[in-house]
Amino acid sequence: RFDEVCKKLDFNVFKVFRDRQITNTLLSDSGDVRVLKSRNISDDGKKIINLSDYDSYINYEALKGLAVFEYLDRDDVYLTPNMTYKPRVMRKPKNCVVNGSLAILIPKKDIVPTDKQMEFFSTQEYREFYQIARNYQTRSLNVDACSVFFYGLLREKGKKSPITEKFIEEDNNVQPTIFEYMK
């Protein structure tokens, strides 16, 4: 089953950013900029959920000094929750940022995932695949530079071999190739 899902996906299409600077001391229940968290994304990844006593905001001046500020007005990146076996992906709305419970997926090329591709991340089929890809881990399920490899985009037509992509880091970070298909 794992290999069958692999054949349906193109891997290694996103880079990932996770905020580690926004802490609860910077947040309030009102303010200039909305801070999205994992529970704000619906289970199907199609909408932002407003939750009383959960939603948070940050002062614009405090936000300007943080790395996540770069993504404030971007809607060409995508959001996915950390620490879950229920992945889902949605386009990031403009005028908001995220805390560390959400990862920002940044397309490596001029990729714009279709609705169908984003919906696939919320399917039971993908979620079972993701559990195997993450080796049924229970402690560290953060979306990081290695695990983002498995956020593959659904293909029109399946591949002959399950995983043919290489993991190559372009920023001169020494990162070995994880997979290489042997012919």
What are the roles of these predicted feature ranges?
Residues 2-183:
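Polybasic, glycine- and aromatic-enriched phosphate-binding surface used to engage nucleic acids
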